[in-house]
Regions:
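Acidic, polar low-complexity linker/tail segments
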Residues: 1-48, 53-61
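Surface-exposed acidic, glycine-flexible loop patches that form ligand/cofactor-binding
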Residues: 11-13, 39-40, 71-75, 128-134, ...
Length: 231
């Protein structure tokens, strides 16, 4: 049994133990309840990178490639790395060990450059891929932050963030241009417990995975013996 505990402000509640849970079945206490652990105990995370394929991002080829490699290195060969390219239609480009992108270049992407980027579909695809992933999970988008090419034709911002939160997926953004983050991206970051990072910062991105691991989850796993008859 997996349980997500939040307060009335939808903030995760962490630090709970077995005595904090009381399980019933048909209004009767269940037998042999066992506390299996909390997601906050995980020391690694599954990460999905979304790479912006809009035309203006091609001016920042080196910065995007550096960001991909730094995030992969920060994972320290723990967890699964996924790479999705966000163009007119999102494409899953890679699933595997973080070391698999150590020679990553934009030329290896199958998705062509596009004047229209379906960000909503890319975020939906990334979230779907993480539903059955490790308990610590995050989407990281790498982009210039210019949303003139972005479209949200199928899912609005509230639907996107709600779907992420319901599946315990946080969202962070790596900015490769020195400009302010758009209001749309800021909304998603702020409503999914994520962070904004600049590729230009002196320390680089080496702490990004540790930051994700420290995000409160409020997800717990328990087991019990059912007294209901089996079919």
């Amino acid at each position: 049994l997996e349980i997500k505990v939040e307060n009335r402000h939808r903030q995760p509640v962490v630090g709970l133990q077995e005595p904090n849970f009381y399980l019933t079945e048909n209004k009767r206490p269940v037998n042999k309840v066992k506390f299996l652990g909390a997601a906050s105990n995980n020391d690694f995370a599954d990460i999905t990178l979304i790479i912006d394929r809009s035309s203006n991002c091609q001016l920042y080829k080196n910065e995007i490639e550096t960001a991909v490699k730094e995030v992969a290195a920060a994972m320290e060969e723990k967890g699964t790395l996924r790479v999705i390219s966000a163009g007119a239609i999102p494409v899953t480009e890679y699933i595997g060990k973080p070391s698999g992108v150590q020679n990553f270049t934009l030329e290896t992407l199958k998705n062509p450059v596009s004047e229209n980027v379906s960000v909503d579909l890319a975020l939906r695809l990334a979230t779907n891929d993480l539903i059955n992933a490790e308990k610590k999970r995050s989407i990281i988008m790498i982009s210039g932050g210019n949303t003139n090419n972005y479209s949200y034709s199928k899912y609005n911002l509230a639907e996107i963030t709600s779907y992420m939160n319901n599946n315990s997926v946080c969202f962070s953004f790596i900015q490769v241009m020195q400009n302010a983050l758009s209001s749309e991206m800021s909304y998603i970051v702020n409503n999914t417990c994520g962070e904004l990072y600049y590729i230009f910062r002196p320390e680089g991105l080496k702490n990004i995975i540790n930051d994700i691991l420290e995000i409160p989850q409020g997800v717990y796993q328990l087991s019990y013996t059912s007294s209901l008859p089996t079919n």
